[in-house]
Amino acid sequence: MLPVYAPPLASLAAYLLGSVPFAMISSRLFGLADPRSYGSGNPGATNVLRSGNKKAALVTLIGDALKGWAAVFVAQKMGFSDNVIGLVALAVFFGHLFPVFLKFKGGKGVATAAGVLLALDPLLGLAVLGTWLFVALAFRYSSLAAVLAAAPAPVYQVQMHGGNGQTLVVGVLALA
């Protein structure tokens, strides 16, 4: 049995992990300007891609997705309840949206949400990613693809598993 203080500590750790700004890190590694200074001003993979450096954008995308996946995966392996895993999932996601290290002005959370969904339920994550890919290829707009992929995520969750605690987490991710 885990100690009573483990869930709040896990949630705090997940929030701090979510706050790690991979767009800033990859931009520095590749000698690029601060991604908040161009394009949409958003510290995310799509805006880093606007710099013209696909490798930096890919590093950002992978880093942002991995932090979402890792937080949930570790919480699962530690034996936390589904409710605590849901809190950890939301904490890492909101850490990306409102990072303490960037004065609470973060990215849109698309890659981090994808990582969270892949860890919570790989089939659900793949369904959402498939929807995103289809829309992105059809319309060539990442933001439109994100909205149209997130919207049916709770429906996919209910179709696959019925309504459960994860449905609430998936719904919050979709609405954010």
Residue ranges and their predicted role:
Residues 49-52, 75-78, 110-139, 151-161:
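Interfacial segments of multi-pass membrane proteins
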Residues 5-30:
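N-terminal signal-anchor transmembrane alpha helix
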Residues 23-26, 46-47, 95-105, 132-139:
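C-terminal ends of transmembrane helices
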Residues 24-56:
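Cytosolic, membrane-interface loops and tails of multi-pass inner-membrane proteins
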Residues 33-42, 101-114, 141-149:
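Short, non-helical or kinked segments that cap or interrupt transmembrane helices
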Residues 126, 142-150, 163-174:
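Loop-to-transmembrane alpha-helix initiation sites
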Residues 6, 10, 56-62, 66-100, ...:
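Nucleotide and nucleotide-moiety/phosphate-recognizing core
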Residues 14-19, 92-96, 132-136, 153, ...:
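Alpha-helical transmembrane segments of multi-pass membrane proteins
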